[in-house]
Structures are given as C-alpha cells and as structure tokens.
C-alpha cells in the first residue's frame, strides 16, 4: 500500500512540474531554478542575496526568473541585459513595487527613492536636480565640509600622538552625519535627537529597506511573520527616532528668524506655497519623506565608500604607497586642501573606481516594477514583474573584468569607464531615470576626506595584525557596510 502512495505522489508532482514547464514555455519567460511550493525561490537567497543570485545566474543565464512567495521576479546580471532594463526600456521598467517597510519610513512613499513612477515622482526628481544637488549648491557647502573634515583630522592627530587605533567606520559615519545635518537640516549632529543613536538609526533603516520582508511576498500571513520575527517592531522604533529628529529640525527652522539656505528651508517654502512643485502642494509628510532619503542615503553611502577605500588600501600596501605618493606630490606642503585637487589625482580616482567595482555600494539596486508587458533579451516580462539589477554580478563577472576578485586600480588606466551611469560595466549609482541624484554632493565629501587622510597621515594595522588578517566581508542591506569595523593606527608625518 505504501508503494502505491509513493507512485501516486510521484506521478502527481511530476505532472505539476511538467505543466509548469509547458506554461512557462508558452509564456516565454526567462529560465530559472525550480521552485518550492509557497515560498518559491526564497530559500535560495541566503544571507547575501547578491552573491546567491550571481551564483544562480552562472547556471540560468544573464536574465533569469525567480519567484519570491507570490511575487514574480526577474534578475538582470550582465551589462547587456542591464542596459535594456535601465536604458532601452527605462520608462517601462523604472517604477517601484509597493514595499511595506520602505513605504513606512518614507511616509507612505512620499519620497524619491521608493515612490512609483508618476507625475509626482517626476516633479520631485526635477526639484532635486534643479534645486538640491546642483553644482552651485554643492559648491556652496564646501566650507561646511572643510570644517568637519578639519575636525576629523584634529581627532586623528590626537589618536596618532597616543598611538591609539581609530575606528574608521564610526568616525567616517559621524563625519558624514555631521555634514548632512548641517547642509540639509541646518543643525549640528551634536545636541540633536540623533546624537547618540544616528549610527543605529541610519544603518538600521538602510538594512531594513534592503531586507526581504515577509509582508512583501506573503500578502495574507506576511505581516504576522514580520511581527513574530521582530521586523515590524524594529521598523516602528526606527521610524519614531527619525520622525522625532525631523520634528526637531523643522521646529528649529520655524522658530529661528535667521534666513537659512539649506534643504529644509526650500521644502518649507514649498509647504507654504512660496515655491511650487508643479501642481502639487507639499504637506509635512512630503517634506519628511524627502528628508528621509537625504538622511539615510546621504550619510550611509558616503561613509561606506570612504571606509571601503581605506580597507582596500590598507590590505594592498603597494596601492596605498602609490596613492599616498601621488597625493603628497600634488598637494606638496599646501595647507588649504580643496575638493578640486582630485582632478590632479588620477591614481586616487582609479582607486575609488576600483573600490566601487569590487564592492558596489548597492549590490542589488532597489527593485523595479514593469509598468507594462515588455520584451527583454528575447524574453517576455509581464506587467507587475519585479526586476532586480545585480550590480555585484556585473562587477565580479570574469567575462567583463579580468581577474575580478583582485584589487587592481591600474585596470582603469587609459580607460574612459566612469561611474556616472553611462558605462554599464560600472554602475555603483545605477543609471537612467533612477540614478542617484546626489552623486556630486556625496563624492565631494569623499574626495576631500580621502585626500586629507592620505596626505596628512601614514596608516598601519593594530599590533599583531597582518595584511592577510584584514577582513573584506560585507554585511547585507540596501547598502553593504563592512562586516567587521576597520581599526587603523594613524602615524604622524611631516605633512600632518
């Protein structure tokens, strides 16, 4: 009798698989791995989905189908397929799915990063490009960046005189937070509602919005699962901390009679109708939603770029020596280091590009959603399909990059490849309509800080550590930080 049940079960499940294959063939969907009932391919993601998807793409191709619970997904993993998604069919593929926790922390999708493609999104995008992140505005905040970098240099000098290690993760996060608080919110990080929790709130939020939440994939029971796992309560805690900070910043602006020229001031003018946002009247939630993007993306991305650059430099002594020699030759004994000095530092620019390549800031771009049926790479992508762009896979692909696991800045020598979204071999900030609008603002701080760190100090590992001991593993989130903090000992030099 038991044998009979086994035969029936075998025939039943075999029939299901055959039917699925036939249906899939008729739909002409991209190939993909077999799925489990209910959960689909979620079990194959692991703790680092960008790496898992890259591994799967080596078997199933540059455009593959996955199923996450009830959500149909495709993953693009090569420059060719990604170019189709981000350029050829940018309009059809640039909307966003409604994701539970990003919606919560952006005041119901009133932001730029997570809101769907719409007239409102186009107006906010236009406002950020024309008003917030212009070259003129970036330049206007140079004095603030110089002051905060000078404060960091003073701290490192004290640590160097005592031969004490510096936690660069923490110090660079604080630097970035201090700059963003001043240029965007008009207040100092020290003394603000986020003074003691900014690191937890920023990194927690970035990790939260990059997570694969049950509520997004299981409409009926997902929210219950997230309450059991604690994801829901974590979201509420982070949201309340951010909201209190925004209230404090806005109150400060409303009570201060001194006219400011920062980002909150512009948004408050739009609330009052003094400046327009097309046909839309901004509410307080719109203001906070836009500020949420600036706070989280602005602080975390710049800090992580600088941390990863210093990580790869200390783990590659040859590269560190070459980069420092260039910086010291160009800067010489000039006290007034400026951001524009980066234009004469060709090797340092190569180091930054190589860091973007080997550790892209956002290894999986924020999911997109097809707004209509579209054909990509010869396959049909139905409307409402989620589209993941795996930047990690492109940057580590041996068919795209020679020796992709090695850190070799010289690969960019005499190369026109840049990171501004036009070269699909290197896309740390994305491309197309959804490209990060704050590249100029973030990179200005990155350049100024790295030049100072390399010019003024030598760096060595803590006692007992060797170069081989430097950990290069990333944690997973929307932005992938270094898993183990980078501790380095600064050394005073004649340039300090």
From Swiss-Prot:
Stretches assigned to coiled coil: none
Bilayer-crossing regions: 2-22
Domain of life: Eukaryota
GO cellular component, one term: plastid
Entry membrane topology: Single-pass membrane protein
InterPro entries, alphabetized: Cyt_P450 (IPR001128), Cyt_P450_CS (IPR017972), Cyt_P450_E_grp-I (IPR002401), Cyt_P450_sf (IPR036396)
Cell compartment(s), UniProt: Membrane
Keyword Heme part of the UniProt annotation: yes
Keywords from the named record: Heme, Iron, Membrane, Metal-binding, Monooxygenase, Oxidoreductase, Transmembrane, Transmembrane helix
Documented EC number(s): 1.14.-.-
GO terms, molecular function: heme binding; iron ion binding; monooxygenase activity; oxidoreductase activity, acting on paired donors, with incorporation or reduction of molecular oxygen
Family (UniProt): Belongs to the cytochrome P450 family.
This protein's name: Cytochrome P450 71B12
């Amino acid at each position: 009798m038991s044998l009979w049940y086994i035969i029936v079960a075998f025939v039943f499940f075999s029939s299901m698989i055959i039917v699925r294959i036939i249906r899939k063939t008729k739909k002409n969907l991209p190939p993909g791995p077999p799925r489990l009932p209910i959960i689909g391919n979620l079990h194959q993601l692991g703790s680092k989905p960008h790496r898992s998807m890259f591994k799967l793409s080596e078997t199933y191709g540059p455009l593959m189908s996955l199923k996450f619970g009830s959500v149909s997904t495709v993953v693009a993993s090569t420059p060719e397929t990604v170019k189709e998604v981000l350029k050829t069919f940018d309009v059809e593929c640039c909307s966003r799915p409604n994701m539970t926790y990003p919606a919560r922390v952006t005041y119901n999708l009133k932001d730029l990063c997570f809101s769907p493609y719409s007239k409102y999104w186009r107006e906010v995008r236009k406002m950020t490009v024309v008003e917030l992140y212009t070259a003129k505005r970036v330049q206007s905040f140079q004095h603030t960046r110089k002051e905060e970098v000078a404060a960091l240099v003073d701290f490192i000098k004290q640590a160097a005189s005592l031969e004490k290690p510096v936690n660069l993760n923490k110090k660079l996060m604080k630097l970035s937070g201090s700059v963003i608080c001043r240029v965007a919110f008009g207040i100092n990080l020290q003394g603000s509602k986020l003074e003691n929790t900014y690191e937890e709130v920023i990194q927690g939020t970035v990790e939260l919005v990059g997570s694969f939440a049950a509520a997004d994939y299981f409409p009926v029971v997902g929210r219950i699962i997230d309450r059991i796992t604690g994801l829901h309560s974590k979201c509420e805690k982070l949201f309340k901390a951010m909201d209190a900070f925004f209230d404090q910043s806005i109150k400060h602006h409303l009570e201060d009679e001194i006219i400011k020229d920062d980002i909150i001031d512009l948004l408050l003018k739009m609330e009052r109708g003094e400046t327009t946002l097309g046909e839309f009247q901004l509410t307080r939630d719109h203001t906070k939603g836009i500020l949420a993007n600036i706070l989280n993306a602005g602080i975390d991305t710049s800090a992580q770029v600088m941390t990863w650059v210093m990580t790869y430099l200390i783990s590659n002594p040859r590269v560190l020596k070459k980069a420092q020699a260039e910086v010291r030759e160009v800067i010489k004994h000039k006290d007034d280091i400026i951001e524009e000095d980066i234009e004469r530092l060709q090797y340092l620019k190569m180091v930054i590009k190589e860091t973007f390549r080997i550790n892209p800031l956002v290894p999986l771009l924020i999911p997109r959603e097809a707004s209509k049926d579209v054909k990509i790479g010869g396959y049909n992508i139905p409307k409402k399909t989620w589209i993941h762009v795996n930047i990690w896979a492109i940057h580590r692909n041996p068919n795209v990059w020679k020796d992709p696991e090695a850190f070799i800045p010289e690969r960019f020598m005499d190369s026109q490849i840049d990171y501004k979204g036009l070269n699909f071999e290197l896309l740390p900030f994305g491309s197309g309509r959804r490209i990060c609008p704050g590249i100029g603002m973030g990179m200005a701080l990155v350049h100024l800080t790295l030049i100072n760190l390399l010019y003024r100090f030598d760096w060595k590992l803590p006692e007992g550590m060797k170069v081989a001991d430097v950990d290069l593993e990333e944690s997973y989130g929307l932005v992938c930080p270094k898993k183990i903090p980078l501790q380095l000992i600064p050394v005073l030099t004649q340039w300090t």
